[in-house]
């Protein structure tokens, strides 16, 4: 991750009007606006978010801002421009940094900074990012946040008005493919279908559970085939046979492993 302060050459205070976070491997950008950000000093495309009270700009609009400052991908002489700058392919990050983010439309530019130089209020925002997400039955989601908060969400309520989510709501396998967005900025299905962490944190039903408690359950109450065999005083082959005959029900399995709830293994022992 690389961090840049967005400054305005025409602003004599030289203060940062925004901060750009670049994730090179993921090829994603996010913009954070300071708490004291002034709409009149903020880049135009970002000021509209500020007026709505949003200070974290999602990946889509952050990338739009970046794209407005670099050579467009449909430029007729793009190949020559890339060769002249030693680039083998169109790389938004490299095109942005080679000019320090300057463009002819305004006086904004980028200055590299270290993580210790970002505003302290960003630390609090980071605590409200997503740590993990678990898909539950009936389009429910269990979302863990970095500050320890856990919330249960109904995706129907979250996204039913957004037609882009229809395939997710209509297909369980697609729904279960939910992932944490880059650096916890939200949850996503694929690259562009995302729900921001701020919306998730502000809504949903709080659950009296912590990530550590959840880990404790998994650590103490989930066993593999070898542990199940030891508990039942039998071989792994016997455990596999019980699973094949529907006497034990794996909660997760792959080509070379099976995981079981310890409680079910214990119940089998009593029969």
Predicted regions: what they are:
Residues 239-240:
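Helix-turn-helix DNA-binding helix
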Residues 35-47, 165-184:
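Short, solvent-exposed cationic patches
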Residues 214-236:
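Polyanion-binding surface elements
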């Amino acid at each position: 991750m690389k961090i840049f302060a967005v400054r305005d050459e025409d602003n004599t205070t030289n203060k940062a009007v925004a901060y750009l976070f670049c994730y090179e491997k993921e090829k994603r950008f996010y913009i954070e606006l300071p708490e004291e950000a002034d709409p009149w000093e903020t880049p135009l495309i970002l000021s509209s978010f500020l007026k709505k009270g949003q200070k974290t700009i999602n990946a889509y609009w952050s990338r739009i801002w970046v794209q407005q400052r670099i050579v467009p991908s449909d430029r007729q002489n793009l190949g020559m421009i890339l060769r002249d700058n030693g680039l083998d392919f169109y790389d938004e990050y490299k095109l942005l940094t080679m000019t320090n983010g300057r463009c002819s439309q305004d006086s904004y530019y980028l200055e590299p900074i270290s993580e210790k130089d970002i505003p302290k209020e960003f630390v609090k925002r980071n605590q409200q990012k997503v740590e993990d997400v678990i898909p539950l039955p009936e389009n429910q989601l269990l979302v863990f946040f970095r500050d320890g908060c856990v919330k249960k969400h109904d995706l129907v309520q979250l996204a039913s008005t957004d037609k882009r989510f229809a395939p997710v709501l209509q297909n369980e396998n697609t729904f279960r493919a939910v992932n944490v967005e880059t650096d916890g900025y939200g949850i996503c299905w694929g690259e562009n279908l995302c729900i921001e962490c701020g919306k998730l944190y502000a809504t949903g039903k709080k659950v009296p559970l912590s990530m550590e408690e959840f880990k404790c359950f998994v650590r103490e109450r989930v066993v593999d085939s070898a542990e199940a065999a030891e508990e039942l005083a039998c071989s792994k082959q016997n455990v596999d046979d019980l699973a094949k005959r529907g006497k034990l029900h794996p909660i997760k399995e792959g080509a070379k492993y099976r995981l079981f709830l310890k409680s079910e293994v214990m119940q089998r022992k009593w029969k």
